[in-house]
Amino acid sequence: MAPLGDGGAAAAAASNNLVVSFGEMLIDFVPDVAGLSLAESGGFVKAPGGAPANVACAIAKLGGSSAFVGKFGDDEFGHMLVNILKQNNVNAEGCLFDKHARTALAFVTLKHDGEREFMFYRNPSADMLLTEAELDLGLVRRARVFHYGSISLISEPCRSAHMAAMRAAKAAGVLCSYDPNVRLPLWPSPDAAREGILSIWKEADFIKVSDDEVAFLTRGDANDEKNVLSLWFDGLKLLVVTDGDKGCRYFTKDFKGSVPGFKVDTVDTTGAGDAFVGSLLVNVAKDDSIFHNEEKLREALKFSNACGAICTTKKGAIPALPTVATAQDLIAKAN
């Protein structure tokens, strides 16, 4: 499948190609020098983040149609983030402001290999306070794909809002896309995280998990296919496991396989999984026959691997998101 190029942007703007992302958007503070602890870091670079918002921006940057639903503090950071969504051509009509809570912050420790550790300030932050009554369910029902993570499941009232939006999407025949995006420091305990993440597992049509998340959820070796397949259920259309720079594995009812990744100079892995998901959802929204056509799926996953790889070459998530041209260039150079 050819990913959306310049000629596909107009078609993507049609509402039947709309991907609505639900959840959190926050400010990541990334150290200006990798390999130091938060206490040792001399300075930090401010970067917009939050997995569902990263996905929305990734889709729009690739010429797709995306919207974001979530709540922000009525503060400078909150307004800055919503403006960033708009600047990235993301529909922000589902964005709300809370006068009594702050926008969430995260301090990110960068290891020498670009992997990360997080320290969050969100107790409670505005995104946690979104209520069911505040939802724009009309926007959700207009989507071709409804995408979400698990952080919005951690506490009320956001959990109830998440469940209501998901129910509305399913009732309207919208495809449900789930990337758990495990962040253990935000959950009361690892067991609570596992239980919460799996509580909505069987509602999804498409699930993307990392190899580390497979290991966490199954308490087993992510390289053992038996453990991966324990996450499969009847009704799931596609399960994708991302394996970092090694690429990804895919599983459908009728076929399974793997697609190799791309070698790049990794600086910061923040947002790589979101770039991967966003690029895949652009293609799913455009043509969901990729769930049944292995050749199309493999081509789409190759493009997604390229998008994820490119995102690791700069600090921060949204600023590092690829364009169609940069992804195609990486693919061409690797051939």
Curated annotation (Swiss-Prot):
One Pfam assignment: PfkB
Protein's GO biological process: carbohydrate phosphorylation; fructose metabolic process; starch biosynthetic process
Keywords noted in UniProt: ATP-binding, Carbohydrate metabolism, Kinase, Nucleotide-binding, Transferase
Domain of life from the UniProt record: Eukaryota
Pathway: Glycan biosynthesis; starch biosynthesis
Molecular functions (GO terms): ATP binding; fructokinase activity
Enzymatic reactions: D-fructose + ATP = D-fructose 6-phosphate + ADP + H(+)
Residues annotated as signal peptide: none
Tissue-level expression: Expressed in roots, at higher levels in stems, and hardly detectable in leaves.
EC number: 2.7.1.4
Protein activity control: Inhibited at high fructose.
Gene Ontology CC annotations of this record: cytosol
InterPro entries on file: Carboh/pur_kinase_PfkB_CS, PfkB_Carbo_kinase, PfkB_dom, Ribokinase-like
Family: Belongs to the carbohydrate kinase PfkB family.
Function statement: May play an important role in maintaining the flux of carbon towards starch formation. May also be involved in a sugar-sensing pathway.
Stated name of the protein: Fructokinase-2
Organism: Zea mays
Lineage of the organism: Eukaryota, Viridiplantae, Streptophyta, Embryophyta, Tracheophyta
This protein's encoding gene: FRK2
